[in-house]
Amino acid sequence: MRFVHAIVVLIGITSASTAFRDLDWYECMLQYQIYPRSFKDSDGDGIGDLRGIVEKLDYLVDLGVDAIWIQPFYKSPMRDLGYDVSDYRSPDPMFGSMTDLENLIKAVKERGLKLVIDFVPNHSSDEHDWFKLSQEGMAPYKDYYVWADGRIINESHTDVPNNWISLFEGSSAWAWNEKRRQYYYHVFSIKQPDLNYRNRALREEIINILRFWLKLGVDGFRIDAPGWLMEAPHFRDEPLNPDGDKGFAALQHVYTMFQEENFDLIHEWRMVLEEFKNKDGHTRLLSVEDFSVPQFKARYMGNSTYLMAQMPFNFMFEFKDYEENATNINHSIQSYLKTLPASGISNWASESHDYTRIPSRFGAESVDAWNMLQMLLPGILNVYYGMELGLEDSFIRQDQRQDHIGRTQFDTTTRDTSRTPMPWDNTKNGGFTTAEKPWLPIHSNYVHKNVKSQLEDPKSHLNTFKRLVKLRKTHVIRHGRFDTYVLSTWVFMYTRTLESETIAVIINLGTETEQICANNVAQTLPGVMTVHTPSRNSGYQIGDEVTLTSLIGRPCSELRPKSGLVLSTSNADTYSSGCSIFSNCIINLIVLATVMSLSTKIID
């Protein structure tokens, strides 16, 4: 015999089925992130483009996507693969023309989808006309960027203005400009000078760019790098970080990150979006990239009288790997939800263009379980292209790398590994391009891990994903109460309950088969539930019965390592137009137990 201590932390979201509120389009959306270089090439040059996205819109509709977020397509010298913009109003020719972009916007709307685009306001390319004119000292561009004189060492020598460090370079964030005879600040690459938001003329330029895209019909923006938008005007040295090592981590970034004025800028941009909503009643979304602590996420959301971003990205799952146990997962979810302000909407992301994909952090066998974990949580789901297939990171040789970071500070890694082309079928280059060679090598497993083959396999990651998307649209998921449980060290469970219906999601994060005696810590659960969706590696089939309580002659069911189950008390086939969101203004937050320790006697 053995004794297992189960930690139970329950947060309840309650809602009466007769009181569903019609929520805005973004509040429970499945947003699909497209890295345009890697999604689909339409013209045979080896690089994905706007027409390629249009070609595959019907695939996204079939997948159940609500909105697509397209990463930078702006004109750029591509020193940071589009995050160094040289013209904020034009697509880069490698992606297509303005006509192609307008056709994409039209095609998205025709299919009932929403379109969110990346916006990169912290910096531009040094090849932007603004910078060229600024270095010449020409009005009104003279102070569009952060310029400073050097520190005087002696009569014949000067040094950089202060000790500020570049995130990308790992050395001084100041670069000398011979034409202007001053230094300019760049928190990222030397080719990405920071814009100066203490200049009112620049702020008006940015506002007009937002209006330009809103008039074209985009439904929202994802703001890149908002934490760095403004710097302290005094240019003092930043204090050393006692826990830091070298490079960017060597300093405490008290003067270059999360300045109070950053939040005012987000409010200013949100009010531009509200201008358009006031005209036609259609909400535009402002989301922000945010890797900060939960308290800053709440700040980015503002409040009912000071509107800011509706969605600061929640990347907590991106920083997790195979070391995470059930208690850690539970704590992360609870901590995040508890910091949401009254009007806050929860959102979840586990992959992106900057970080390693799920199967490369947790193992290929974990794909279905991790999709189950995140897809039925309350609020918004962000899906990085290929996540539905279980795409893995690729091995990219040094001579194949395209990412600037991979060539500088972080020599042992590169973001290219998670940016490789989407495999559409098992033909050459996965059907991504007709070119001899794509811009990055496609993963070598494309022959069996591609869209076409997975659509034909009922138990594939893709079809499991589609089944979960369908379940996301039911009343019990969109409106149901939310409770979390730790069944054992490595087994995590949460439930969604609405009236007499319950959905339970159970995942085994560990490396051994575990009993799932869920009824011991969730006494309101029935002793037996039906499998709605199994992970491929679980050993269960749709419709199987799972025993959640230990009875005489019938022990609890078991769950294989790295596998997951979605269990149901009913068929769960009803669709809903509403959404469940973790928001204190519309739900009843009930802390049933802060920490409860149970000793459960289990017969081996």
In which residue ranges do the predicted regions lie?
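Hydrophobic residues within beta-strands of alpha/beta enzymes
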Residues: 68, 221-223
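Acidic/aromatic-lined carbohydrate-recognition and catalytic surfaces
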Residues: 17-211, 215, 228-294, 422
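Sec-dependent signal peptide recognition
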Residues: 2-9, 587-591
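Conserved alpha/beta catalytic core and glycan-binding cleft of carbohydrate-active enzymes
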Residues: 112, 126-163, 266, 270-421, ...
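Active-site rim elements
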Residues: 193-203, 253-258, 357-365, 371, ...
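Carbohydrate-interacting/catalytic domains
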Residues: 2-3, 15-75, 102, 106-108, ...
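Terminal signal-anchor or tail-anchor transmembrane helices
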Residues: 587-601
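C-terminal GPI-anchoring signal of eukaryotic secretory precursors
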Residues: 570-587
